[in-house]
């Protein structure tokens, strides 16, 4: 429109790539300063939430700018640090999802933090912002080093977050276990990155892909070849990233950390870092290592990891009586489902990537709704056993019916968004030649009915002497927003499917 100044005219295009990161960083600094001067800490929660929402709005406004859209379509998206950070459709989508996760966690945790973290009230939100910033760098990076830096910012902040209940033995144990295993996984990942650099002579993903496609000083000059160094580098990368998403066989940390960490922290871990790590896997393996004959090799390994994660996660979840441990193993199984799309992206890249993006979004909004209820139950009476949910349909009908819908979605029963997500994963796997993996995914979905049904049966059929729950505005709002998200993604799925397909097609 005449007279309307576009976003790209106001801001240097190179800064557009990190504008949401700058807003989150500024929010973090503002909260730290205000924390030192304000005695009323609870009001600062809304400052934190406002900064995250502002960062989300900046993504929407930037992504809708015609000049930026034209640049992305022409293969010239806004870049920063010489192309190490990039603002393409994939970046916009994943940053929007991650900021949405952070916003919901901030909202659901307000009462819990006020009750249990009086001595570290604002530290909790400051660390949430730091983790969010690290995740955003992970998904925005087109360089192995910046991906690793983002991952380490995420990981180190997460270790602190897991142990933020300083006087709680389980929280301290969770932090220690997470730190020891996470530091080892980070070292393995860094070693893998160094081997990839040694093979290709670059840490920039486009240059890595070009070197592998055309030969380098280590890869045979006659063409691409699987050298021992390259195989070792890919293997170490898979182990490191597999740990971050809690994929079998490097999943053992997840149940203990999920159980011991504060419930809002567990909610954050189950959706945020997992989604960011999945996006980083796509960046590295599709954007850097997505060159024949390498794709079919790493795709098969991810397919095997997906199969193991689905099966182990669901089978062990059947045996759990602690609902946080049950959801930890459910999260491992969900990671397996998402890895089906990662495996499919090796041969059907656009459809595979699109299915991963859609499922990450659907899983995040569903899982956060579940953990919002779990958070209220924990803060109300330390109720973390499945039996503690007896009679919840009478104690709080909203929570009981919301959990029922969320469980139905995670199982993948039509017509929920969970069914749509699994259908897209199934279709991508079948199109890539992994029909056996698609069938195994369907079988595992049936297995998962067992442990979800146990909770539903306790909520609706068992009698209880537990009192009614004290109202919590933040948690109730989170449950309602999650319900709205699940319903909206189910009824109005087509725009979101198109959005994920466009983001997948523009992955650089």
UniProtKB/Swiss-Prot annotation:
Instruction: Give the membrane topology.
Output: Multi-pass membrane protein
| Signal peptide start and end residues | none
| Ranges in a coiled coil | none
Gene Ontology cellular-component annotations: plasma membrane
Q: Which GO terms describe its biological process?
A: ATP synthesis coupled electron transport
Keyword check for Zinc, yes or no.
no
Broad EC category: translocase
**Record has Translocase as a keyword:** yes
| Annotated transmembrane regions | 14-34, 43-63, 90-110, 119-139, 144-164, 179-199, 223-243, 275-295, 298-318, 327-347, 353-373, 400-420, 433-455, 473-493
Q: What is its main location?
A: membrane
Cellular localization per UniProt? Cell membrane
The record's InterPro entries line, in alphabetical order, gives: NADH-Q_OxRdtase_suN/2, ND/Mrp_TM
Enzyme Commission code: 7.1.1.-
Sorted alphabetically, the keyword list is: Cell membrane, Membrane, NAD, Quinone, Translocase, Transmembrane, Transmembrane helix, Transport
Family affiliation: Belongs to the complex I subunit 2 family.
Subunit: NDH-1 is composed of 14 different subunits. Subunits NuoA, H, J, K, L, M, N constitute the membrane sector of the complex.
**What is the protein name for this chain?**
NADH-quinone oxidoreductase subunit N 2
* Naturally occurring in which organism (per UniProt): Symbiobacterium thermophilum (strain DSM 24528 / JCM 14929 / IAM 14863 / T)
């Amino acid at each position: 429109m005449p007279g309307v100044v576009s976003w790209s005219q106001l801001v240097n295009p190179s800064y557009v790539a990190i504008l949401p990161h700058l807003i989150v960083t500024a929010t973090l600094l503002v909260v730290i300063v205000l924390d030192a001067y304000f005695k009323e800490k609870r009001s600062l929660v809304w400052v934190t939430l406002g900064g995250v929402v502002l960062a989300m709005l900046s993504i929407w406004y930037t992504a809708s700018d015609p000049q930026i859209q034209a640049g992305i379509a022409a293969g010239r998206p806004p870049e920063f640090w010489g192309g190490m950070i990039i603002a393409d459709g994939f970046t916009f989508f994943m940053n929007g999802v991650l900021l949405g996760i952070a916003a919901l966690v901030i909202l659901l945790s307000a009462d819990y933090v006020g009750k249990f973290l009086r001595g570290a009230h604002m530290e909790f939100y400051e660390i949430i912002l730091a983790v969010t910033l690290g995740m955003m760098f992970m998904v925005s990076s087109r360089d192995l080093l910046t991906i690793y830096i983002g991952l380490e910012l995420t990981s180190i902040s997460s270790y602190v977050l897991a142990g933020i209940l300083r006087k709680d033995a389980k929280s301290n144990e969770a932090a220690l276990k997470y730190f020891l295993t996470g530091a080892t996984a980070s070292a393995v990942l860094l070693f893998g990155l160094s081997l990839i650099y040694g093979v290709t002579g670059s840490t920039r993903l486009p240059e890595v892909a070009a070197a592998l496609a055309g030969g380098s000083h280590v890869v045979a000059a006659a063409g691409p070849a699987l050298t021992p160094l390259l195989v070792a580098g890919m293997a170490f990368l898979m182990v490191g990233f597999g740990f971050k998403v809690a994929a079998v066989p490097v999943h053992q940390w997840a149940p203990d950390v999920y159980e011991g960490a504060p419930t809002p922290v567990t909610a954050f871990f189950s959706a945020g870092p997992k989604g960011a790590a999945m996006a980083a896997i796509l960046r590295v393996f599709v954007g850097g290592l997505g060159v024949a004959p390498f794709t079919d090799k790493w795709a098969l390994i991810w397919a095997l990891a997906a199969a193991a994660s689905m099966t182990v996660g669901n089978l062990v979840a059947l045996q759990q009586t602690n609902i946080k441990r049950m959801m930890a193993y459910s999260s491992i199984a969900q990671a397996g489902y998402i890895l089906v799309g990662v495996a499919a992206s090796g041969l059907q890249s656009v459809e595979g990537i699109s299915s991963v993006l859609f499922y990450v979004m659907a899983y995040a909004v569903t899982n956060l709704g579940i953990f919002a209820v779990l958070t209220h139950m924990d803060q109300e009476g330390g109720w973390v056993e499945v039996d503690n949910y007896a009679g919840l349909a009478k104690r709080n009908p909203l929570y009981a019916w919301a959990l029922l819908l969320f469980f139905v979605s995670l199982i993948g029963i039509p017509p929920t968004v969970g069914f749509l997500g699994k259908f897209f994963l199934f279709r991508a796997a079948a199109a890539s030649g992994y029909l056996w993996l698609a069938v195994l995914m369907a079988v595992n979905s049936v297995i998962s009915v067992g442990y979800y049904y146990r909770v539903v049966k306790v909520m609706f059929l068992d009698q209880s002497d537990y009192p009614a729950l004290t109202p919590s505005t933040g948690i109730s709002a989170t449950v309602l927003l999650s319900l709205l998200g699940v319903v909206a993604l189910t009824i109005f799925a087509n725009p979101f499917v198109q959005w994920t397909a466009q983001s997948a097609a523009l992955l650089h």
